[in-house]
Amino acid sequence: MATTLFIDADACPVTREALSIARKSKVSAVLVANATQNLARYAGRAGVEAIEVSGGRDAADFAIVERLSSGDVVVTQDIGLAAMVLGRGAAAITPRGRRYSATTIDMELAVRHAEQRHRRAGGRTKGPSAFEEEDRERFSAVLSSMLSESDPRA
């Protein structure tokens, strides 16, 4: 079973669902975000730790990776953070309920890099589709399954 659920809480649309699932699964949760996210609203909740970081744009990512152990689960939409998480022997899931995979993460990083280069050169790329209730439901089902598995990386 996962020891800890980390939530990259900068603009995470499923924080409430993730915390509820962690509580039901008896897994501790750690919210990590920059100071603009008002994590104080989670103070005092049993099984929830809120960590506010300051500094660069990747400060929350590095704070998560520093605390991560093999078998933990991270909720993030950041492909770079997901790659670091997988490299540390933990599991990662998007807010839309898609598990990141060690077999596809290199391709996802390459696509992200190519799109960044295209945008820097003045090109346009398609953004993500609107977040819908179906995404929220898929996330909840997949995260519940991951937290009940003996090895959430599977």
Locate predicted features:
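Nuclease catalytic cores that cleave nucleic-acid phosphodiester bonds
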Residues: 2-154
